[in-house]
Amino acid sequence: MIYWTVCGPHGIIEKGIILREEKVSLMRMKVSDYIAQKLVDEGITDAFMVTGGGAMHLDDGLGHQPGLHCYFNHHEQACAIAAEAYARIHNKIAALCVTTGPGGTNAITGVVGGWLDSIPMLILSGQVRYDTTARWSGVGIRAMGDQEFDITKSIACMTKYSEMVIDPMRIRFCLEKALYLAQTKRPGPTWLDIPLNVQGAFVETEDLIGFDPEDYEAGGTGWAGVYESDPPHATAEDFAGNGEQREPELPKVT
């Protein structure tokens, strides 16, 4: 006997009989695809990239996103300098995507230039799975995963905001925060380091919570516009302000 199956809109169908009902969500997306769509929704039209295994989901999402033009350079330093020059010429922010380890460290020179000259840039870097990072191990080793380097510690001094995104449900908040800070007040680079397991995770987009600029500018975390207290996806760093550089108050000239 030959059996055949087809996928219907509500489940798996065999010979016209529904065998299993499954929840259908038109808003379920892979995080990397959500990032790519979000960039376009926020007005970003160009991305400079060097592909790599540590950023495979990001590379796929950005590379296939309608409305996003991807330029594949031969070196990450060229990507960063191109993103900086793009902002100078077009007066708008571009995205930069690199892989883990040397992919991130190679981009640093161009990011330093963006920091010193107050140029808005959004850097997305791939990272090994979080459960293979030295940070996850908690034992003080320097590296555990293949081609791993905790880049956020190195670029904190040259970015307005940086974070390793380890919770897929934070991705909207982190993206909106990074884009807001990169382009407001004194502009500058912002950097999101995204492990492979987060890049490839699936989320219900309607459950994602965004960043609240008004709360942030009032000295809050950016969550309070949605939650009065104890946001479920907030981290201790949100409350401590780690990974970001708020605008200092300039001394008054008398």
Per-region residue spans from a language model:
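Short, positively charged and aromatic/hydrophobic N-terminal segments
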Residues: 3, 12, 17-18
